[in-house]
């Protein structure tokens, strides 16, 4: 029986202590809000002309996304509010040494700080967490929030661009005569310094895969041209200068675009007879149009600037269109014939002699008649003389029925038939009359072959002119494509964020560069 009695006594003591602690906190709350008559609608000042100092700081936990089409920056942040409320002061010794009191945010006065440049119509902080109140009247409120802020996008150097996205906080309820916005201060070695940067905890920060943070400055802006009675007189702005990581766009957009655009040079290597020169050029043009359509869906519909990729695609499309026109002209030249066009001597000299030498084009040389051709020509004269002798000795009946008599078994003539003696003029006339049809036929064949060779040679000259134009265009288009591509994309490579957040201000607004007060 002795064992359970001490146990029950210990439990009773714990319950009494717990109830006493709860009673002290409850008594403190009653003292602050009921006995003192706390009113959360009134500013925590003794006189009307007094100003409440509100200090702000921002902790970035995640840069979620930047939607270029909507021009919206989505961030996950913690915004720290701090101010002095003299009505919430107490003596800790009178209330069980309670130095910190956690209260719902709807029980105390709030400065109503909102994100002025929000992009979703939600000005207020959605999650109202508790406030921390110390016995000295110092109030701290650290609510988390997911902000969707407006961020004007500059597409000039896409995808080698950087953006300056800011989060502008101000009070839409109180003017500069009622509250004074400032940056929160920290102490180090008995010296205080303002937090002039966005706080990032390396352990709690999630890095974005598309953007990297270059500068994260914080600054209080006061516009003296705006009267203090206006809510636009002052604000606290947190600047996020971010740079795009272009690797994704280089692999998926730039490299395919460049490769497809340079394929247009292969058109000048295709022979005119294949009939695919224009088809290849038009296919490249269609592919560039598809890429341009994809990029237009990625960027905001703005007429302020043209992105680098858009400039390159437009440059390539203009060049490809010119190549299509050149292909049509080259095909027209290639299929020209002597029956439709005449190749002038000036064009022949320029495109068949001068330009090929400059473009290092080689053409098979024409073969000169050699000694074998002369031997063949002299030997043919012997055949002709033998034929004349044969025709002069044979009678017409034998010439006409020689084979037929052999088929019927008739003996050949042992002696040659000779015509009665005639004058030499008659013999020559008869021989001429007999040989004239054959000679005329041979002359016709020779003239026809000569005309055909001349026709083919002229047609080959037109083909060579077309090849020369192709080679000339290849030597012109390729350097233009290379220089144009390098000039366009080097603009983006050298487009870097400024070394300091604000032009003309040498201060870096970084944790390592603190300005002590």
Curated annotation (Swiss-Prot):
Mind listing the UniProt keywords for this protein, alphabetically?
Answer: Cell membrane, Disulfide bond, Glycoprotein, Ion channel, Ion transport, Ligand-gated ion channel, Membrane, Phosphoprotein, Postsynaptic cell membrane, Receptor, Signal, Synapse, Transmembrane, Transmembrane helix, Transport
Ranges of the Extracellular topological domain: 22-245
Record GO terms (molecular function): acetylcholine binding; acetylcholine receptor activity; acetylcholine-gated monoatomic cation-selective channel activity; ligand-gated monoatomic ion channel activity; transmitter-gated monoatomic ion channel activity involved in regulation of postsynaptic membrane potential
Q: Which residues lie on this side of the membrane: Cytoplasmic?
A: 334-471
Task: Extract the Gene3D superfamilies matched here.
Answer: Neurotransmitter-gated ion-channel ligand-binding domain, Neurotransmitter-gated ion-channel transmembrane domain
Phosphotyrosine-modified residues are 390
Membrane topology classification: Multi-pass membrane protein
**Does the record carry Signal as a key word?**
yes
User: Which parts of the chain span the membrane according to its record?
Assistant: 246-270, 278-296, 312-333, 472-490
Subcellular location per UniProt equals:
Postsynaptic cell membrane; Cell membrane
Residues carrying a glycan: 97, 164, 190
Q: Which InterPro entries match?
A: Neur_chan_lig-bd, Neur_chan_lig-bd_sf, Neur_channel, Neuro-gated_channel_TM_sf, Neuro_actylchol_rec, Neurotrans-gated_channel_TM, Neurotransmitter_ion_chnl_CS, Nicotinic_acetylcholine_rcpt
Where is the secretion signal located? 1-21
Indicate the principal place this protein occupies in or around the cell.
membrane
Taken from the UniProt record, the cysteine pairs bridged by disulfide bonds within this chain are 151-165
Spell out the reaction equation it catalyses.
Answer: K(+)(in) = K(+)(out); Na(+)(in) = Na(+)(out)
Enumerate the Gene Ontology biological process terms: acetylcholine receptor signaling pathway; chemical synaptic transmission; membrane depolarization; monoatomic cation transport; monoatomic ion transmembrane transport; musculoskeletal movement; regulation of membrane potential; skeletal muscle contraction
Q: Which CDD domains match?
A: LGIC_TM_nAChR
One annotated Gene Ontology cellular component of this protein: synapse
Family in the record: Belongs to the ligand-gated ion channel (TC 1.A.9) family. Acetylcholine receptor (TC 1.A.9.1) subfamily. Delta/CHRND sub-subfamily.
Role of this protein: After binding acetylcholine, the AChR responds by an extensive change in conformation that affects all subunits and leads to opening of an ion-conducting channel across the plasma membrane.
Q: Which PANTHER family match?
A: NEUROTRANSMITTER GATED ION CHANNEL (PTHR18945)
Describe the subunit structure.
Answer: Pentamer of two alpha chains, and one each of the beta, delta, and gamma (in immature muscle) or epsilon (in mature muscle) chains. The muscle heteropentamer composed of alpha-1, beta-1, delta, epsilon subunits interacts with the alpha-conotoxin ImII.
Q: What is this protein called?
A: Acetylcholine receptor subunit delta
Native species of this protein? Rattus norvegicus
Instruction: Give the gene name.
Output: Chrnd
């Amino acid at each position: 029986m002795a064992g359970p009695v001490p146990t029950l006594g210990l439990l009773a003591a714990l319950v009494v202590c717990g109830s006493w602690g709860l009673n002290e906190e409850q008594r403190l709350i009653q003292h602050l809000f009921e006995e003192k008559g706390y009113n959360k609608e009134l500013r925590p000042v003794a006189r009307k002309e007094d100003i409440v100092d509100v200090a702000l700081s921002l902790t970035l936990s995640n840069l979620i996304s930047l939607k270029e089409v909507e021009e919206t920056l989505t961030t996950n942040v913690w915004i720290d509010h701090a101010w002095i409320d003299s009505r919430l002061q107490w003596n800790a010794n009178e209330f069980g040494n309670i130095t910190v009191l956690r209260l719902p945010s709807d029980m105390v006065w709030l400065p109503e700080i909102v994100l002025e440049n929000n992009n979703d119509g939600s000005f207020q902080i959605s999650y109202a967490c508790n406030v921390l109140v110390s016995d000295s009247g110092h109030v701290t409120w650290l609510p988390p929030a997911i902000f969707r802020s407006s961020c004007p996008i500059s597409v000039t150097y896409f995808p080698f661009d950087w953006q300056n996205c800011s989060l502008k906080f101000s009070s839409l309820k109180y003017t500069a005569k009622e509250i004074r916005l400032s940056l929160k201060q920290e102490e180090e070695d008995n010296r205080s310094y303002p937090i002039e940067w966005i706080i990032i905890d390396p352990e709690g920060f999630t890095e974005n895969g598309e953007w990297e943070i270059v500068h994260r400055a914080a600054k209080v802006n006061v516009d003296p041209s705006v009267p203090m009675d206006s809510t636009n007189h002052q604000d606290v702005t947190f600047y996020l200068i971010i740079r795009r990581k272009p690797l994704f766009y280089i692999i998926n957009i730039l490299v395919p675009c460049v490769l497809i655009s340079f394929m247009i040079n292969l058109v000048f290597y295709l022979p005119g007879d294949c009939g695919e020169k224009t088809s290849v050029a038009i296919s490249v043009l269609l592919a560039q149009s598809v890429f341009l359509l994809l990029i237009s869906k990625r960027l905001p519909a703005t007429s302020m600037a043209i992105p680098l990729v858009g400039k390159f695609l437009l440059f390539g499309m203009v060049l490809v269109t010119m190549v299509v026109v050149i292909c049509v002209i080259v095909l027209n030249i290639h299929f020209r014939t002597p029956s439709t066009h005449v190749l002038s001597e000036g064009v022949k000299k320029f495109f068949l002699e001068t330009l090929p030498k400059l473009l290092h084009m080689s053409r098979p040389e024409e073969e000169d008649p050699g000694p074998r051709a002369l031997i063949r020509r002299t030997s043919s004269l012997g055949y002709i003389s033998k034929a004349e002798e044969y025709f002069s000795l044979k009678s017409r009946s034998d010439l006409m029925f020689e084979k037929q008599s052999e088929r019927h078994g008739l003996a050949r003539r042992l002696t040659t038939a000779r015509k009665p003696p005639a004058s030499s003029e008659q013999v020559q006339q008869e021989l001429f009359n007999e040989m004239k049809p054959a000679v005329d036929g041979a002359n016709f064949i020779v003239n026809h072959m000569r005309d055909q060779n001349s026709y083919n040679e002229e047609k080959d000259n037109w083909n060579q002119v077309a090849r020369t134009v192709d080679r000339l265009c290849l030597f012109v288009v390729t350097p233009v494509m290379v220089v144009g591509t390098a000039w366009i994309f080097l603009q983006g490579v050298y487009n870097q964020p400024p070394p300091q957040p604000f032009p003309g201000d040498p201060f870096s607004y970084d944790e390592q560069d603190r300005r002590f007060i």
